[in-house]
Amino acid sequence: MDLIQQLTVEHQDYALKLATLAEVIDGIDANGRGNYFIATLDELLVPFTTELADHAHREEEFLFPRLLERAPDSPVAVMLAEHQVILEQSAQFGQWYNVWRDGDDDAYRKWADPALDLRGTFSTHMQKENLILFPLARRVLTDQEIRKLSDVGN
């Protein structure tokens, strides 16, 4: 599986996790704190913090520079700006979720709102990458370049 395929698969996994995140927040809004919700959020914390940062890093370090070389007018600058917003939302979720989890009910909106914002921002961002950026990469990069990116990006 090459780097672009791997990133696309990760996007599909994130889309499912984002839906789960929104469902859990809806559940907490309706029912309050509960062990099921906390267990589910605990499972989502690493994917939406550490793993998400790693995903963005692989795009920024391996794919985006090659795209800028070959297609300087590509939407890479937009993608980079969106990465900043997404990673900030991710950080807010990670920081305040743990405070709330440890018992501070006032921290709920401080993590839930950024998490819901993350869902919207990241969902549209992934669509741009899947529908515009990745097909562009396949057009302007050779198969050999994509294989090389895959070797260093994994």
Enumerate the language-model features and the residues they cover.
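Small-residue-biased structural context
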Residues: 1-154
